[in-house]
Amino acid sequence: MRPTILTFNLNENRLSKLRFLCMKLGLAVKAVPTEDFCQPISALCGMTEPVEAAPAEGFPEELLIFCHMDNAAVNRFLQTAKQMRYAPVALKAILTPTNAEWTPAQLCRELKDERAAVMRGETTHEE
């Protein structure tokens, strides 16, 4: 599958700049419309078929999900974004077997909870 970045809640200007950045790196960008927020992330990145689902809760935060990308590709993206002075997106995740079954809102909540725990100096998962 082609390396893809799923985007959520980016305004048109931010999305346009991100598309340019990703074009330089050979990455696809998929802006996920709010009506698809009910889908599992696996369906949004093309791993599974879409499901019949009730409308999902939205969220206002910007979110990026790196799909079908290894750590080196994610790091290249982050370095290039910094070099191009692309304003950071606070919430980012790499697709995993666990989060693939979540909706974007579930992932957003988890990322915000993890971020808050780190700010408090706590660990977020059992070791």
Where are these regions (language model features)?
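Short, intrinsically disordered low-complexity segments
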Residues: 37-65
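N-terminal, charge-rich interaction modules
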Residues: 1-47, 122-125
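Generic detector of short, locally flexible boundary/turn motifs and exposed helical patches
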Residues: 26-33, 55-59, 86-90
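Helix-rich interaction surfaces within compact, conserved domain-sized segments
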Residues: 5, 14-20, 30, 74, ...
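Short, structured motif recognition centered on aromatic/hydrophobic residues
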Residues: 4-7, 22, 59-67, 77
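Short beta-alpha junction loops
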Residues: 11, 36-37, 70, 96-100
